[in-house]
Amino acid sequence: MNALGRHILAEIYGCDAAILNNRNLIEKIMVESALEAGAEVREVAFHKFSPQGVSGVVVISESHLAIHTWPELGYAAVDVFTCGEKVNPWDACNYLTERFKAKHMTATEVKRGVFEEPVKVANL
């Protein structure tokens, strides 16, 4: 691979508002999505806003997953950034879309740390 990692920017629409407004459930689903993708979870931090919305991050050995929700719009903005080749960020995005009971998801993949020559990084 000539890139250090893959960064998925996902727009998830038509989600269940009750799910998107539940901090504990969002944290659980985000951790599950990281594990579903084959990642190793290191740390988590989530915050519930008033009157609604949740933001959070799951730090993984391979990078991170982040989310910001707008329950009133049924919308979640999700970033899944993974380094190396053993973790598939699309698996996490698809898992989240399913668990949020979303109507649809659009996403863009960005290669991060692109080098002209193949790179070899320890433990990746």
UniProtKB/Swiss-Prot annotation:
Cofactor note (record): Binds 1 pyruvoyl group covalently per subunit.
Reaction catalysed by this enzyme: S-adenosyl-L-methionine + H(+) = S-adenosyl 3-(methylsulfanyl)propylamine + CO2
PTM info: Is synthesized initially as an inactive proenzyme. Formation of the active enzyme involves a self-maturation process in which the active site pyruvoyl group is generated from an internal serine residue via an autocatalytic post-translational modification. Two non-identical subunits are generated from the proenzyme in this reaction, and the pyruvate is formed at the N-terminus of the alpha chain, which is derived from the carboxyl end of the proenzyme.
Pyruvic acid (Ser), modified sites: 63
Cysteine pairings via disulfide bonds: none
MF annotations from Gene Ontology: adenosylmethionine decarboxylase activity
Annotated InterPro entries: AdoMetDC_C, AdoMetDC_fam_prok, AdoMetDC_N, S-AdoMet_deCO2ase_core, S-AdoMet_deCOase_pro-enz
GO biological-process terms attached to the record: spermidine biosynthetic process
Cofactor names: pyruvate
Active site residues according to the UniProt entry: 63, 68, 83
Site feature (Cleavage (non-hydrolytic)) residues: 62-63
EC number: 4.1.1.50
A single Gene Ontology CC term: cytosol
Biological pathway: Amine and polyamine biosynthesis; S-adenosylmethioninamine biosynthesis; S-adenosylmethioninamine from S-adenosyl-L-methionine: step 1/1
Keywords from the named record: Autocatalytic cleavage, Decarboxylase, Lyase, Polyamine biosynthesis, Pyruvate, S-adenosyl-L-methionine, Schiff base, Spermidine biosynthesis, Zymogen
Function: Catalyzes the decarboxylation of S-adenosylmethionine to S-adenosylmethioninamine (dcAdoMet), the propylamine donor required for the synthesis of the polyamines spermine and spermidine from the diamine putrescine.
Family to which the UniProt record says this protein belongs: Belongs to the prokaryotic AdoMetDC family. Type 1 subfamily.
Quaternary structure and partners: Heterotetramer of two alpha and two beta chains arranged as a dimer of alpha/beta heterodimers.
Name used for this protein in its record: S-adenosylmethionine decarboxylase proenzyme
Primary gene name: speH
